[in-house]
Amino acid sequence: MKALKIPEATITRLSIYSRFLKRLDKKGITTVSSGDIAEGVGVSPAQVRKDLAYFGEFGTRGVGYNVKDLIRYTVKILGLSDPWNLVMVGAGNLGSALVTYREFKDRGFSIVGVFDNDLTKIGKRIADMEVLPLEELSRVVKEHNVRIGIIAVPSKAAQDIADIMVKAGLEALLNFAPISLNLPDDVEVRNVDLSVKLEILTFNLALKEK
């Protein structure tokens, strides 16, 4: 299986399926159909089957999928069989919220270091974490085998911070700054621009009024 041939939308839905399946498992449900999954996450049964077919054959026709088995498969496909350590640069309001975001831990992600270059923030604590100076980034990345970093700084600082993070050895960045980053091709970057998501909502609402 070559990951590059898998549509990113499929990976996104796979994560949603995995989360839904874990909720079913907590309720004691042992078997689920593609129709059940589709209804639970808001897609068609055909879409569920198509997404899963990228990765092999799952389930039994007429019976459905074993919930625990499908959870195990999706977790493995998403690379979540082992926990992932993260670092974050930016100890402002957004960074503080992300540190305490419970879903990270529930999904196997652990923030092991928070950094800032603002002297008024360095040394302070966010939840149970002390904010460290950027000079400590490389050390923490190496000590905790960190491959993924989160950028939670203003857009004017994002490119410089991204360069520092890549130099420290990070291979993938989740960027919350509303700016496109110029980085080497082998660095994975995903941008999260909340204003864009809001503009999609306003577009759809405006469309309804026409």
From Swiss-Prot:
Keywords: Cytoplasm, DNA-binding, NAD, Repressor, Transcription, Transcription regulation. Its main location: cytoplasm. One of its GO terms (molecular function) is DNA binding. It is found in: Cytoplasm. GO terms for cellular component: cytoplasm. Gene3D superfamilies: NAD(P)-binding Rossmann-like Domain (3.40.50.720), Winged helix-like DNA-binding domain superfamily/Winged helix DNA-binding domain (1.10.10.10). NAD(+) binds at residues 90-95. GO terms for biological process: negative regulation of DNA-templated transcription; response to redox state. SMART domains: CoA_binding (SM00881). It comes from the Bacteria. Pfam families: CoA_binding (PF02629), Put_DNA-bind_N (PF06971). Residues 16-55 bind DNA. Transmembrane segments: none annotated. NCBIfam families: PRK05472.1-3, PRK05472.2-1, PRK05472.2-2, PRK05472.2-3, PRK05472.2-4, PRK05472.2-5. Modulates transcription in response to changes in cellular NADH/NAD(+) redox state. HAMAP family: Rex. Belongs to the transcriptional regulatory Rex family. Homodimer. This is Redox-sensing transcriptional repressor Rex. It comes from Desulforamulus reducens (strain ATCC BAA-1160 / DSM 100696 / MI-1) (Desulfotomaculum reducens). The lineage of its organism: Bacteria, Bacillati, Bacillota, Clostridia, Eubacteriales.
